[in-house]
Amino acid sequence: MRSVAVAMEQPLHGPPGLSTILARTDWAEPWLLGLAGFHVLCFLLTCFSFQHYRVQIGHFLCMVCLVYCAEYINELAAMNWRLFSKYQYFDSRGMFISLVFSAPLLVNTIIIVVNWVYRTLNVMTELKTLQQRIKAEKDKKK
């Protein structure tokens, strides 16, 4: 725990990379555990909503709105980080919030879009098969 505190206090030389941010983050902080739980719930809802289009569309739109608002959330968190965190993770570039908040939400939205494309291709294939079957039946009648 002491090494995390020392690492967080060291000045950065240039923009931090992914490995630097991951190494300097105290993953045992309650708010980060809560955020991880939120992402697990979002992923489960993504998986369970495949058969319910309206739920999936609402879930998709909520996640897109959250990603859109990430900059504002980052600014708010940067001003009030002492209320919920031991360290100031929220920089002006938004690298931390992009990694721990936006990236998992975007992965979920990509899963949903891939599912939509897959289903659309299946419907198009079924439609073309049906059209060919109807055409073949018409040709038989002639």
Curated annotation (Swiss-Prot):
Residues 115-142 are annotated as: DNA-binding. Residues 120-142 form a coiled coil. GO terms for molecular function: DNA binding. One of its GO terms (cellular component) is nuclear membrane. Its main location: nucleus. Residues 51-56, 115-142 are nuclear. The chain crosses the membrane at residues 30-50, 57-77, 94-114. InterPro entries: TMEM18. It is a multi-pass membrane protein. PANTHER family: TRANSMEMBRANE PROTEIN 18. This is Transmembrane protein 18. The lineage of its organism: Eukaryota, Metazoa, Chordata, Craniata, Vertebrata. The gene is TMEM18.
